[in-house]
């Protein structure tokens, strides 16, 4: 490997205290300024004895955590921050990962909010894992119970109460709150953390909040970023003041591969083993991979390799980290490394993570970082209406963030599993904003619910392509969420209340008409959680046989329903899941999602009903309800043996994971998967007459491209027009 030494974060160090707006001439002067503004507030390095939030003495744990807090780089900037917060409505803050900005600054904002009244503080995170784990940590630092004064809110899970003062939440959840409270009146301060990630929800929130702060002079907005490229945020928010907080940084040695790696997963696992065996300094390893399956596979293989090497090698504890892990397993990343063994061989932990560990979470003790140079990214093609998660090269900014994780506590090493030439010449400088590569159906529905009708002139930081917006409007019009003038319909208003894609929301609401809303609730919940079928490499045949025991002849949606029913009949037994190769966590999560969706249905008086199981219409009604949401995601079997998607004319195949043992003429599909081939995944057999009768606007044959499907539908249309056939339907 070639190597080059760099100083991670050196840009901060030289500039941080020279910023005229953010730095103070002396701590005493700053404290005096803040004291004048906030009526006596002076930063205190001595821990107080009484907790004003609970009126009880602080615990010993609080005292211990306080000593760690005052050692964080951000702590000496407390007076500067409080001064800026008092003088300005919007602040842009750049703080490197590990500076303490995510845990400390929201707590200072609580002090500010309490001094002004009793309104709360919201701090958004792009990822649910970060929202949960940071809320847990901050509740400990504030010596309060999680879910009371400090809480979190993520999709399908709200751990907060009316008295919560500080709420960590995903950016999407704050956007959802704005739909019912457009002025966000319950908040005194809103912090947008990790704004540099430019997620879809964060970009929309910035546009919404820019307008809200114009109308609410008392609301404070803090935009926090971990990268130096803050000028764009300042400019967007009318030249808001910039505050820079340096992180603790140590030199990081960067190693590149001389040649591109053919199999980055194999190379990454090999590098972990080499580091553990050959590096003579203590320190943990952080390895970046792209998703849950890859991470679980890597953990198994690393464990197997280490076990095969025998007891002479120090213990290596492998800990996975991805967004759908339950909170108790997420906390394992903070466990200490194993001690050295009897012969002195070093014990380490290796955290195998998605890009959540780039900036959202800080793991102390990491000295070695392995960066294969890939992450999963959403991509969208509006012409064929296909959105997919693809494994894509990361940006230079992400690569720098990753390497910086190695220099947090001492000098470290970063092993980049790509060439230096690829880093310099092939990687983009920054990650492309998600709004420019996403299906905007959900976003447009939310903006319409917020009362923002003129989408063309909405103040996007980076405006999406007009074609993408038009596709979203077209989708919502066909789903009857918008009328022909683009106005929100009553149905659209109800759809917007469900934390679901518009198609799923429409399907769920329409299921009431087909007397199967209980079953569609279960299917929707199963589609909203990670894949429930487990297929380990060492037991693929047994896993496939187990899956076929749940298979339904009409397709995968009904197979998912069978799995959910069987899980409930087993009394939610984890052992039953293990024996049947079912992911227990996915099913528990689906059960929770189902309960949340049922509550929303009850709120809108949407009846929860079922067709009699013995009726011949039981499964027919469910399939008709599926069509009501997914009539735009239909494929027709051609004479070639391939499927052709309706209207978009994409050649596709059924995904190998399907339970269908035959090829129906017409199928609806849940997702389009782009790999080396085009696949449609989670498919169900449907009747073409349902398409024509349940979605006549979309299946208007006058606006149909010439294809085999059109000819079939024309013949069907003629039959439908005869009285006898209509009666039969």
From Swiss-Prot:
Residues 1-25 are annotated as: Disordered. Its EC number is 3.6.4.13. ATP binds at residues 95-102. Residues 82-246 form the Helicase ATP-binding domain. The keyword Heme does not apply. Keywords: ATP-binding, Helicase, Hydrolase, Immunity, Innate immunity, mRNA processing, mRNA splicing, Nucleotide-binding, RNA-binding. One of its GO terms (cellular component) is spliceosomal complex. GO terms for molecular function: ATP binding; helicase activity; hydrolase activity; RNA binding; RNA helicase activity. One of its GO terms (biological process) is positive regulation of p38MAPK cascade. It catalyses: ATP + H2O = ADP + phosphate + H(+). Residues 271-451 form the Helicase C-terminal domain. A motif (DEAH box) lies at residues 193-196. It is an enzyme of class 3 (hydrolase). RNA helicase involved in mRNA processing and antiviral innate immunity. Acts as an activator of the p38 MAPK cascade. Belongs to the DEAD box helicase family. DEAH subfamily. DDX15/PRP43 sub-subfamily. This is ATP-dependent RNA helicase DHX15 homolog. It comes from Drosophila melanogaster.
